[in-house]
């Protein structure tokens, strides 16, 4: 009789422990979601700038595919990766449109377009501005993705180095982040980088940039670089998985 009672007590103890552990495992995902670090990420704004747009097609490959369309496609994919991690993302354009329409008799459209992008970054109070572009060269063998920064902005440089490190993981010839004198990067009030995602003058690279899966890999690398560069006061989560 005593043996039966002891076995029953042990069974009840085991059942209680199993119930408690099961409850903790069930609640763990919900407990994790309320960690303040994610809410801090939600307070971090990144401005993505798909270069060109509308009447400004940018450069193009030999088949006539325009830079503006590639820039926009990759920017949308970067936004998806960052928002998945809780980052607030603003884009200078979400469709094929220019930010400074052509006005007959008035010059300086390009500068007005850049100024409009800068103002959007400032009004959004963005921590980083990441401008996406494609490159072109008279040397058809030139290729590679490069992140540019303003040499007087250490925060922008750190962001460019972080992005470049991730880009080098997916390109055959590693490149170095480089300083550049660009009107967009020299403006005060935000930390900007320009990411050239490849040369449309290079046949192989141009073909890759037309592929959605390759665009996804580029976007993932840039998003990873942005997340790694965030201040240490914010969490650094990663998107769910790297593209195959």
Predicted feature descriptions by range:
Residues 1-244:
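Catalytic-site microenvironment of enzymes
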